[in-house]
C-alpha cells in the first residue's frame, strides 16, 4: 500500500507517544512538544533532500494551524495557503487539512477547501493512533494530494502561475 519513497519518508519522521487532544489540557502540552519535534525533523529532512514544500505555525494553544505549502511544476513554484484545526477527538480523529483558495476547483475536496483523504489516508491514520501526528498528516495526506491534484489543475487551466 505504501511505496518505498513514502516508507523512507515515514521512517524519518519520529513517532509520537502521548495520546492526548486539546481537551486533555494537562498532557496536551506534552503532545504538542512531540508534534513540534516531529515537524521540525520532517522539515529538516525535506530541506536536506531538496524537497522543502511547506511551513506551518500554530496559535498559542496548538489547536489552529496555518501556513503555506508549495508545489513545483515545470520549474514554477505554485504556492497556497494551508490551514486546519485540531479536532477535539484528536489524535483518534485526523485533522482535516484545507487549501481554501482551491475550494470548488477539484472534485477531491470538500466545502471550505478541505482536501479529500478518506480512502487512503484515514484508514492508515486509524491504524497508527497515537503514533501519527501533524507531520504524518502532511507527508501522507497533503503531499500526495498536491502531487496528484496540482498538475491536473494546471493542465486543465484551472490554476495558473502567479508572479511574485
From Swiss-Prot:
Residues at the catalytic site: 116 (glycyl thioester intermediate)
Keyword presence, Ubl conjugation: no
Highest taxon, organism lineage: Eukaryota
CDD domains found in the cross-reference section: UBCc_UFC1
Stretch forming the signal peptide: none
A GO BP annotation: protein K69-linked ufmylation
A GO molecular function held by the record: UFM1 conjugating enzyme activity
Keywords assigned: Ubl conjugation pathway
Gene3D superfamilies: Ubiquitin Conjugating Enzyme
SUPFAM superfamilies (UniProt xref): UBC-like (SSF54495)
One Pfam family of this chain: UFC1
Any one GO cellular component localisation term in the record: cytoplasm
Family from the record: Belongs to the ubiquitin-conjugating enzyme family. UFC1 subfamily.
UniProt-listed PANTHER family: UBIQUITIN-FOLD MODIFIER-CONJUGATING ENZYME 1
Name by which UniProt lists this protein: Ubiquitin-fold modifier-conjugating enzyme 1
